[in-house]
A protein has these predicted regions:
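Short, acidic, small-residue-rich periplasmic hinge/interaction motif at the N-terminus
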Residues: 53, 59, 113-161, 169, ...
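Extracytoplasmic beta-strand/coil segments of soluble accessory domains associated
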Residues: 108-111, 144, 169-214, 235, ...
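A beta-strand signature from Gram-negative outer-membrane beta-barrel systems
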Residues: 227-276, 910
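Transmembrane beta-barrel wall of Gram-negative outer-membrane proteins
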Residues: 288, 294, 298-457
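Face-selective signature of the C-terminal outer-membrane beta-barrel domain
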Residues: 440-454, 482-628, 715-717, 761-764, ...
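Structural signature of Gram-negative outer-membrane beta-barrels, strongest in the C-terminal barrel
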Residues: 440-442, 555-559, 563-565, 582-723, ...
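Membrane-embedded beta-barrel scaffold of Gram-negative outer-membrane proteins
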Residues: 493, 502-518, 653-655, 659-665, ...
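Gram-negative outer-membrane beta-barrel transporters
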Residues: 603-608, 616-617, 708-725, 742-840, ...
């Protein structure tokens, strides 16, 4: 048993939480009389019955179970003063037609009068339908970050539903310090950036414990790191910022959980089904070879203006031309449905078996940009000289290296898309499958098999083909296809009344294929409809156990385990033969690790943490040097590297609801498969070393009830981070004097540094809720050498477009009305300019090989309304980008705008 004082402290934190979870069993025969007679101060205003019961649970530390439908449309009177639990329940339920029953020392159930006895079988299993459990002995997942001594965050299913955006990447908006890159050209994928670090395995992203990540070559613009999922099948997203001994993610871990049988089957039922359907607006059907934006052709000649009397009309021969795309400005009406989605999930659940099957489908055409902002324009600069050649950049003092234009037309704006214009190649069609089966044995044993499938058809194009303000976008006739299949096996052993065994083991495999049309046409002899791309096979396994020991000298918690992962990537059949220039990576990478974490609590207010991880990586390059250019270094390379990653921390809890923590870690990341295997124009560097990130995390958590008003709840999480990444792995442009062709290679720079502040808060009063998330970067810098640190990203490096905004602020508000049946809300998001500058290409004497994607500060407003028609049906509407802003997303590889104002409506049925 845990020490009594520890239990008291845990209860103090749990008072301030509201947990919504299935109630599996409630026993009878508890000694509850004395507990029920204890007097507690209450400050509960007159409000809906559901809100009053939540306030009662927080103040009394009771867990209340009831059917959601029982409280719809019911109000409760104000409660002010010191009362027993019985007194409060009597007053709240007076005249409601409901009664209560104590089912444990700190638990109570509510049912219709006369139905309490029928609600329980002899063995105490509840038969109520949709159960809401409020307060008591569990912390809701959305509340957990506010009592976790680490920089964590959680995105709930409710938040995903309300603010899902036009791409899965949009679900991370509103999370301090976290964004997803390539939101508009990512083929419906997720590429998570945590505090300025992303890609190459720096952020470990899983779905039900399995990875389906793939790296996509984007020409000179770098790579995309893609994970695929449909938001309709997600039940929540847990985020750990920074390293953890149990994870390979040096910058953090994103663990997405898909729906389980318990999320679908209502309490007391054996079967359940959930059906969703909806539509959206602001999109148009793609038409092949359509062009958008402006095409400007300026005509001039080298050298200064010719002023010769014998050629008086010479300049009149150089008249520029300006044309614009046709058929892309016909934006549909605001409420005209132009895209749709639907999903169905069915499940069965009993004491031994859980089964679930789900399918989700969505289809959208090309979205339209907003109208208010820096859209494309063409300005007449008149007669002018322009330095737009390499010769001029190298020798600007020679006037004959300049170009003279009698009339020069210049693009302006953020992109080459006009206000409200159709953004080409942004269409997306996806289908997702989900299967799960779980078998529970005696003594806490269980096994679970799972399968997820995902297929997408998108207008995704190679990013290097879409850049340049003067480039006119063209709708490609061929699409990019992704096909992912993942299988999982999970074993759990968690016997009751055993604090030493909580065993978890997982085995998973993912097969991922992506096919794209040849970027530059490919071979003329290629088969009709030929597409090329990478094939990736990934295996993973892990095992861990948690043990708790109570001693006379304090409590000790241990977590220990091991993991293994194999990645094997190769070009698809025909890629080297028909996609004449593209040489994709061909190799494999393995990584094994073991770890142990310990938490020691000598007294109630102090916790000491420590951890140690050892990891080892092997990689093998299978590239064939005879296939492409023998002048380049395609030599087969093998990497082998490993090391230890220690961590420690301290947590102090001086008073109820207040927690201070300080954590330090020194974590190793070996080169990823992208960094250790050769590809087109990118050479392996045998001298590449592992990154080591030395991270400091300082933070405070506050949870307080009745701070500003009776029965309110306030939660605050404030943190400071300082990351120093030694031997940061980057990419550079270089020319080997022994080779004919220049190229790019992976290198280690001295270090990269990231530091900043993060704030997350939530305030609840009755049916009102306000959440604020903000982050501010104090420092971002890259140091090529120890004495050459700059607050600029490096020329030709992948990090060019991974630098986040200087700061971001998100405010989310919601209010329940009509006895909690109606919820109105919205979110205001402000994104600042880029945190730092960018190193110039001229410093290298070469052209720009990664174009910096620029954006301007912008503010987006999203609103929503949800109406619970009854216990089975919920209708929702939402408007995203309410003010129709024209903006460019940060962390993109292409210079194109995000979606303009879009209306969505949906209906969810649950039985």
């Amino acid at each position: 048993m845990r020490m009594l004082m520890r239990v008291k402290w845990l209860k103090a934190f749990l008072v301030a939480t509201t947990a919504i979870m299935p109630l599996v069993a409630i026993g009878e025969g508890y000694a509850v009389a004395q507990t029920a007679q204890n007097r507690v101060p209450y400050h509960i205003p007159a409000q809906s019955l559901a809100s009053s019961l939540s306030a009662f649970a927080r103040a009394s530390n009771y867990k209340i179970a009831y059917a959601t439908s029982l409280t719809l449309g019911k109000m409760a009177p104000a409660i002010e003063g010191n009362y027993t639990a019985e007194d409060v329940l009597e007053r709240l339920l007076s005249g409601s037609g409901l009664s209560y029953r104590f089912t444990g020392e700190k638990s109570v159930s509510i049912a219709a009068i006369g139905q309490q006895d029928a609600a329980f079988q002899a063995e105490g299993t509840t038969l109520l339908d949709t159960i809401t459990v409020t307060g008591g002995q569990g912390i809701a997942a959305a509340d957990a970050p506010y009592s976790t001594a680490a920089p964590t965050a959680y995105i709930s299913e409710q938040t995903i539903e309300r603010f899902r955006g036009s791409s899965p990447a949009d679900i991370f908006r509103g999370t301090a310090g976290v964004m997803s890159a390539e939101a508009r050209n990512g083929a419906g994928s997720i590429d998570v950036n945590i505090r300025g670090m992303q890609g190459m395995g720096r952020v470990k992203t899983t779905i039900d414990g399995a990875e389906n990540a793939i790296n996509i070559y984007q020409g000179y613009q770098g790579i995309s790191n893609r994970t695929f999922v449909d938001p309709d099948l997600l039940a929540g997203v847990e985020i750990q910022k920074g390293s953890d001994a149990a994870s390979s993610g040096i910058a953090g871990t994103v663990a997405m959980r898909t729906v389980e049988a318990g999320d679908i089957v209502k309490e007391g039922n054996r079967f359940g089904i959930r059906v969703k359907g909806g539509f959206g607006t602001n999109s148009s059907k793609p038409v092949g070879d359509t062009v958008a934006g402006y095409q400007v052709i300026n005509k001039g000649y080298a050298g200064p203006k010719i002023d010769d009397p014998e050629l008086p009309d010479y300049d009149s021969l150089f008249v520029p031309s300006v044309t614009s795309g046709e058929g892309t400005m016909n934006r549909p009406a605001f409420l005209q449905p132009t895209n749709g989605s639907g999903s169905i999930v069915a499940a069965m659940k009993d004491e031994q078996v859980e089964l679930l099957a789900g399918y989700a489908y969505r289809k959208r055409g090309n979205y339209h940009a907003g109208k208010h902002g820096s859209a494309a324009q063409v300005n007449d600069r008149g007669p002018t000289s322009v330095c737009n050649t390499l010769s001029c950049q190298l020798n600007p003092d020679d006037p004959y290296n300049w170009m003279w234009y009698p009339q020069y037309m210049e693009h302006s704006g953020l992109t080459n898309y006009r206000a409200g214009e159709q953004v080409l190649n942004t269409q997306l069609e996806t289908g997702s499958w989900l299967l799960k089966g779980k078998l529970k044995f005696g003594d806490g044993h269980s096994i679970q098999l799972g399968y997820t499938g995902f297929k997408s058809i998108s207008g995704d194009r190679m990013a290097s083909n879409l850049n340049g303000l003067g480039a006119q976008a063209r709708q490609q006739s061929k699409t990019t296809d992704a096909d992912i299949h993942t299988g999982t096996f999970k074993y759990r052993w968690n016997p009751e009344d055993n604090d030493v065994i909580n065993l978890k083991s997982n085995l998973w495999v993912t097969r991922l294929e992506q096919r794209s049309p040849p970027a530059y046409g490919g071979s003329a002899n290629a088969p009709s409809g030929f597409k090329s791309g990478p094939d990736l096979l990934t295996w993973g396994a892990d095992i861990s156990n948690e043990s708790h020991f109570s001693t006379a000298y304090g409590d000790l918690d241990l977590t220990y385990g091991a993991s293994y992962k194999l990645e094997d990537t190769a070009p698809s059949e025909g890629t080297r033969k028909w996609d004449t220039w593209l040489d994709l990576r061909d190799g494999k990478r393995e990584e094994a690790a073991g770890y142990i974490k310990a938490g020691y609590k000598p007294v109630d207010w102090l916790t000491l943490n420590g951890g140690l991880r050892y990891s080892h990586m092997w990689s093998q390059d299978r590239s064939d040097p005879t296939v492409k250019l023998p002048e380049l270094d395609y030599s087969t390379a093998a990497f082998r590297e490993g090391g230890f990653s220690p961590s420690f921390g301290v947590t102090v809890e001086p008073i109820k609801g207040t927690q201070f923590y300080a954590n330090y870690s020194s974590t190793l990341r070996a080169p990823s498969i992208m960094e250790s295997v050769t590809a087109f124009s990118m050479n392996v560097n045998a001298d590449t070393k592992s990154e080591r990130s030395n991270n400091w995390e300082l933070g405070v958590n506050l949870i307080e009830d009745n701070l500003f008003a009776g029965s309110d709840q306030t939660m605050v999480k404030l943190g400071y981070f300082n990351w120093d990444v030694q031997n940061y792995i980057a990419r550079e442009w270089y020319r080997d004097p022994n080779k004919i062709y220049p190229g790019m290679r992976i290198i280690n720079i001295d270090r990269a540094r990231f530091s900043g502040l993060e704030l997350s808060t939530r305030y609840e009063l009755g049916g009102f809720s306000a959440e604020l998330a903000a982050n501010y970067y104090l420092n971002v810098e890259f140091c090529r050498t120890a004495d050459s640190c700059e607050d600029k990203s490096l020329y030709a490096d992948y990090s060019t477009n991974a630098v986040p905004p200087k700061y971001g602020i998100d405010l989310t508000l919601s209010q329940k009305l009509l006895e909690d049946a109606l919820t109105l809300g919205g979110r205001i998001s402000h994104v600042s300019s880029r945190a730092i500058g960018h190193g110039g290409a001229t410093a290298q004497g070469m052209s720009q090989f990664i174009r910096l994607i620029e954006w301007e500060p912008y503010t987006l407003v999203d609103i929503f309304a949800e109406y619970k028609i009854n216990d089975n049906y919920t209708a929702s509407v939402r408007v995203e980008n309410l003010t129709d802003q024209y903006y460019v997303d940060p962390l993109s590889l292409v210079q194109q705008p995000g979606p303009g104002r879009t209306f969505y409506a949906s209906l969810t049925a649950s039985f």
